[in-house]
C-alpha cells in the first residue's frame, strides 16, 4: 500500500468487522463463532490485506465501553475498557479473542469509549436517567454521519440487531437511547412487564429477555443471532402476517424514539438512518416507510452500510492528524 493506512475494528452483535482505509477502502467481517472457536484469526485476516507494520493507526471498539470516557491508547486501558461483559447480549468470546490479538500485536491502537453516565459531553439529565446510552461503535457511526452530512445538529438512528438513537447538538453528542430502554431492533429491545416477571420468577435471565425483546419476539423467531434477520425477511416474503407486524411495530418504536429526541432538542438540521435495517429497501421498504414517519422533523438521509464502517478509520485518521476531540469526547495521546 502507498501512503497512510488506517484501520477500524467493530466488535458487533453478529461478528467483528474491519475497515482498511488507505488509497482505497476495504471491508471484511469475521463471524463470532469462527473467532471464538479459533477457526479464524483477526490478525491473519488483516495481514492478508495489509502489512501490519504499514498501519499508521487503528481505532477499535469493544463491548459496552463503559469503564472509559476518553479515546485512549489500548496500552493505557484496563480490563478492555468495560465494567462487566454482562448485559451486553449473547457472549461467545470472539470479540475478546480479537482484542487480545490486537493488544499484543504492537499495532498503534486507540480504544473508543461507549456513551454512559461518566461521559462528560452528555447532557446531565441523560447521565442521571440512564447508566449506559450507547456502545462505542455508535460514536464512530455518528462521526461518519457528521463528516458526510456536515450537520451540527442531528439525530442518528442505527437500526439492525438492536436500535440505538443519538442526539447531536452543536457538533457534540449530548444524548442517546440505548437498546434496552428505547426502541426495538431485530433481536434486542426494552424489557416489558411480562419479561420482568419472568426474570423475578427465575424463568429467564435478564440477558435472555433482552436478547429476545426485539422484532423476533413478535414474529416468534428463536434462532441464531446471525440468522434472525434473514429468517424474519423470509417470513415476510412468504406473506406471514406476524413478520409484517413485527417490522411495523419495530418501526413504530423507532419513530417514537426519534420524535422524542427531536422534541427535547434545540433544533435539528437532519436525521440519519443507518444500519442493515435502517438502510433496507427490499423486500420491506423500512427506510422509506420510516422516513415518511419522521420527515416532518427535518431532512432524512441514509448512510450506506459500508460507508458507516468508515467512522473508526476516520477517527483514527483525524486523531493521527492532530484532532483532540471527537463529537465532544476527549482524546488522550
From Swiss-Prot:
Regions that span the bilayer? none
Concerning InterPro entries, the annotation shows:
ATPase_NBD, Methan_mark_12
Intrachain disulfide bonds: none
* Domain of life of the source: Archaea
Name the family.
Belongs to the UPF0285 family.
* NCBIfam families found in the cross-reference section: methan_mark_12 (TIGR03281)
Q: What is this protein called?
A: UPF0285 protein MTH_1441
What is the species of this protein?
Methanothermobacter thermautotrophicus (strain ATCC 29096 / DSM 1053 / JCM 10044 / NBRC 100330 / Delta H)
Its ancestry begins with:
Archaea, Methanobacteriati, Methanobacteriota, Methanomada group, Methanobacteria
Amino acid at each position: 500500500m502507498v501512503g497512510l493506512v488506517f484501520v477500524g475494528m467493530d466488535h458487533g452483535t453478529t461478528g467483528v468487522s474491519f475497515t482498511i482505509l488507505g488509497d482505497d477502502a476495504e471491508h471484511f467481517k469475521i463471524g463470532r463463532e469462527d473467532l471464538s472457536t479459533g477457526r479464524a484469526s483477526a490478525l491473519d485476516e488483516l495481514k492478508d490485506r495489509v502489512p501490519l507494520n504499514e498501519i499508521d493507526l487503528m481505532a477499535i471498539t469493544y463491548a459496552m465501553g463503559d469503564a472509559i470516557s476518553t479515546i485512549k491508547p489500548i496500552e493505557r486501558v484496563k480490563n478492555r475498557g468495560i465494567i462487566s461483559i454482562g448485559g451486553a447480549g449473547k457472549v461467545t468470546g470472539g470479540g475478546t479473542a480479537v482484542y487480545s490479538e490486537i493488544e499484543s500485536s504492537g499495532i498503534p491502537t486507540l480504544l473508543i469509549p461507549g456513551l454512559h453516565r461518566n461521559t462528560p459531553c452528555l447532557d446531565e439529565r441523560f447521565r442521571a436517567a440512564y447508566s449506559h446510552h450507547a456502545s462505542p461503535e455508535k460514536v464512530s457511526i455518528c462521526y461518519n454521519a457528521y463528516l458526510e452530512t456536515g450537520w451540527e445538529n442531528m439525530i442518528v438512528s442505527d437500526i439492525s440487531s438492536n436500535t440505538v438513537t443519538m442526539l447531536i447538538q452543536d457538533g457534540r453528542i449530548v444524548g442517546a437511547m440505548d437498546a434496552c430502554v428505547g426502541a426495538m431492533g431485530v433481536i434486542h429491545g426494552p424489557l416489558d412487564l411480562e419479561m420482568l416477571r419472568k426474570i423475578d420468577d427465575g424463568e429467564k435471565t435478564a440477558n435472555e429477555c433482552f436478547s429476545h425483546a426485539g422484532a423476533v419476539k413478535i414474529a416468534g423467531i428463536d434462532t441464531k443471532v446471525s440468522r434472525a434477520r434473514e429468517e424474519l425477511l423470509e417470513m415476510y416474503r412468504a406473506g406471514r402476517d406476524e413478520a409484517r407486524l413485527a417490522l411495523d411495530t419495530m418501526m413504530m418504536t423507532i419513530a417514537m424514539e426519534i420524535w422524542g429526541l427531536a422534541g427535547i432538542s434545540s433544533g435539528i438540521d437532519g436525521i440519519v438512518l443507518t444500519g442493515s435495517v435502517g438502510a433496507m429497501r427490499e423486500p420491506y421498504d423500512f427506510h422509506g416507510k420510516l422516513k415518511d414517519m419522521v420527515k416532518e422533523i427535518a431532512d432524512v438521509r441514509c448512510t450506506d452500510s459500508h460507508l458507516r464502517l468508515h467512522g473508526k478509520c476516520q477517527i483514527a485518521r483525524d486523531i493521527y492528524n492532530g484532532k483532540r476531540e471527537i463529537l465532544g469526547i476527549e482524546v488522550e495521546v
